[in-house]
Design a protein with these regions (language model features):
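Short secondary-structure junctions
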Residues: 73-80
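Helix-start/capping segments and mature chain N-termini
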Residues: 1-71, 86, 91-265
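Phosphate/pyrophosphate-binding loop motifs in nucleotide- or prenyl diphosphate-using proteins
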Residues: 83
Length: 265
């Protein structure tokens, strides 16, 4: 299956593609679409709308997002859809433009989950403007490279005082008995994390959100990561702290995620 790139619903022009390659300013969201629907679509669109106002001063609006998504996925039973916001009026020497951004849609084959399990290493880092899912992602790739050079799969971010926030491409949750603890810290509010949280009561799992220090992770029974491509994946180690897989509980977390039905585009 090929990838199709459209900008405002039309074939992408070379100038617009060149601008995005040269000016790293914008926001995006991405998710799996099946039969014209996606889980957490309302959350994805609300977050993208807020990012548009934050970065450009104006948003195309939900109706336009939905129109462009429908054009992008037409004729596809399943795909991975990315919506990116950018403005050719904004550049390194001309940063002041305020107005509606353009919307690039990329429909491509659905990716596999990140992994069946991961071992991660803690890295002191905080993403710039962490509440935004922005296109400045060099630091995330660099962190993953650094983790793999140390023999791990990925990196878990902590601040200078040792407080846990998020992973490179994912949110993290910690397990103790039949409860989930979400770290409280500056981070991107993940849609998959929100869907799991919404469904935990239905599967008999309690939850709390509070600050979590790296030096207390050994007191938990387990950990997991989540993002749009990987609803639930066990974290089997954080540096030298090893965790059991807890497959039964992780299955309940995935059931919590699945309890939110796909929403039509």
């Amino acid at each position: 299956m090929r990838s199709d790139i459209l900008i405002d619903g039309l074939p992408a022009a070379p100038d617009d593609l060149a601008h995005q390659a040269l000016v790293n300013y914008g926001a995006y969201t991405s998710f799996r679409v099946e039969n014209g629907a996606a889980r957490g679509l309302d959350l994805h669109l609300a977050r993208l709308d807020r990012a548009a106002v934050d970065l450009f001063g104006e948003s195309p609006g939900e109706a336009e997002f939905r129109r462009l998504m429908a054009v992008a996925v037409a004729g596809r039973d399943a795909c991975w859809l990315r919506l990116s916001l950018f403005s050719p009026e904004i550049g390194h020497r001309a940063p002041s433009y305020i107005g509606r951004p353009k919307v690039m849609t990329v429909a491509s084959p659905p990716p596999p989950p990140l992994a069946a399990s991961v071992r991660v290493t803690a890295l002191t880092h905080c993403r710039p403007t962490p509440h935004l899912k922005h296109v400045a992602t060099m630091d995330l790739t660099r962190a993953r490279r650094a983790a793999r050079e140390k023999g791990f799969d990925d990196a878990l971010f902590i601040d200078a005082e040792g407080w846990v926030s998020e992973g490179t491409l994912w949110n993290v949750g910690f397990l103790r008995d039949d409860a989930v603890t979400w770290p409280q810290a500056p981070m991107l509010a993940g849609v998959t994390q929100a869907l799991i949280a919404q469904g935990l009561d239905q599967v008999g799992v309690s939850q709390q959100t509070r600050p979590v220090r790296l030096d207390e992770v050994a007191t938990f029974d387990g950990a997991f990561l989540c993002n749009s491509a990987t609803p639930v994946c066990p974290v089997t180690a954080i540096d030298d702290v090893a965790f059991a897989g807890r497959p039964a509980l992780l299955g309940r977390l995935e059931a919590a995620w699945a309890s939110s039905p796909p929403q039509p585009i």
